[in-house]
């Protein structure tokens, strides 16, 4: 039936062709018999993707399941990251993929890559996104032609590994409070002193993008190289999260570099924040990949496991939990998709990226915890993987801006009043 509003508009001649409109009742929400609800794609994200995006998603998913999934259980147990994975990413074209010279794929395609990798492990996705968003992006965007020529090809192939140094022991959510200094000496070179911490990839890095305050207080970016005198990157041991990602510090003790090591134009927090927004966007997609794995695992477990003479999935509460998971994942993916399209159209804002980063990470952590509970005692066994995802997501919900910091970013945008 036509709505009263539609009938009113028709009677007033507001539609061009009344007869065609009456025939085309699908315009008014009629369910087409051929349409089908898919438990793993409730809102048909698939229908929004281009052919190229579907192809990229399928190829990367296959690579992740065939090459990464068989290694993750022991990598997590042993707290070991396989350096060769970076070269494998390079061969797949997954590093710096949105940069025109290294693939030029859409941001939705990049998000699908991050999603596929994090279905396996958040640490594996961290290694990829740091290289792409926090190292290649600033060199490509802010670097000189010489810096681009020297580093980008090697980073894109995975022959070089990069890291990004912003967070410090006393400057986490407040990066403007950084204590790392770059002081010009009599020879005209910069001498860097300071410590960065919780740095993904630093112990194996060849290229270090670090941010420091120069003498006038401006924050400037520098590109350092492994082997420079006074530069070290000790590993942080004993993590109970992201164990398959290598994490360390960057220690700079009188590291002397020429002015050509500095990004020439960008000043202040605009530089590092542009990198963080790139990374946060990928995290929005990626964390939902971990949630999808946990949801799928809980669903299958509920269908297979029988208690009291019937599958766990036959219970109302179990189904309600699965319905909640499916709802949050599908809504979250639609939001990530929309922001990806906005980025490609040049219309994304930091607040929109904060919204999806905060929503995806918070909801994914809740889903992983719930999945762990639904598996009962098996939920803590690493062969089921959900406890690993839950532990990882505790970190993903924290880094690149904590859940609460993103709430404050949104609060400032909503009210116009900064609270930090």
Curated annotation (Swiss-Prot):
| InterPro entries referenced in this protein's UniProt entry, alphabetically | Acyl-CoA_DH_CS, Acyl-CoA_Oxase/DH_mid-dom, Acyl-CoA_Oxase/DH_mid-dom_sf, AcylCo_DH-like_C, AcylCo_DH/oxidase_C, AcylCoA_DH/ox_N, AcylCoA_DH/ox_N_sf, AcylCoA_DH/oxidase_NM_dom_sf
Which Pfam families does the protein's record reference? Acyl-CoA_dh_1, Acyl-CoA_dh_M, Acyl-CoA_dh_N
Q: Which cofactor does it need?
A: FAD
The pathway to which it is assigned is:
Amino-acid metabolism; lysine degradation; Amino-acid metabolism; tryptophan metabolism
Query: What Gene3D superfamilies does the database record attribute to this sequence?
Result: Acyl-CoA dehydrogenase/oxidase, N-terminal domain (1.10.540.10), Butyryl-CoA Dehydrogenase, subunit A, domain 2 (2.40.110.10), Butyryl-CoA Dehydrogenase, subunit A, domain 3 (1.20.140.10)
What is its subcellular localisation?
Answer: Mitochondrion matrix
Top enzyme class: oxidoreductase
Reactions the enzyme catalyzes: glutaryl-CoA + oxidized [electron-transfer flavoprotein] + 2 H(+) = (2E)-butenoyl-CoA + reduced [electron-transfer flavoprotein] + CO2
Q: Name one GO cellular component term.
A: mitochondrial matrix
* Any one GO molecular function term: fatty-acyl-CoA binding
Q: Where does FAD bind?
A: 164-167, 173, 198-200, 402, 420
| Active site per the UniProt annotation | 400 (proton acceptor)
Keywords assigned by UniProt, alphabetized: FAD, Flavoprotein, Mitochondrion, Oxidoreductase, Transit peptide
BP GO annotations:
fatty acid beta-oxidation using acyl-CoA dehydrogenase; fatty-acyl-CoA biosynthetic process; L-tryptophan metabolic process
For this protein, the record's CDD domains field holds: GCD
Family in the record: Belongs to the acyl-CoA dehydrogenase family.
Report what the protein is called.
Glutaryl-CoA dehydrogenase, mitochondrial
Q: What is the lineage of its organism?
A: Eukaryota, Amoebozoa, Evosea, Eumycetozoa, Dictyostelia
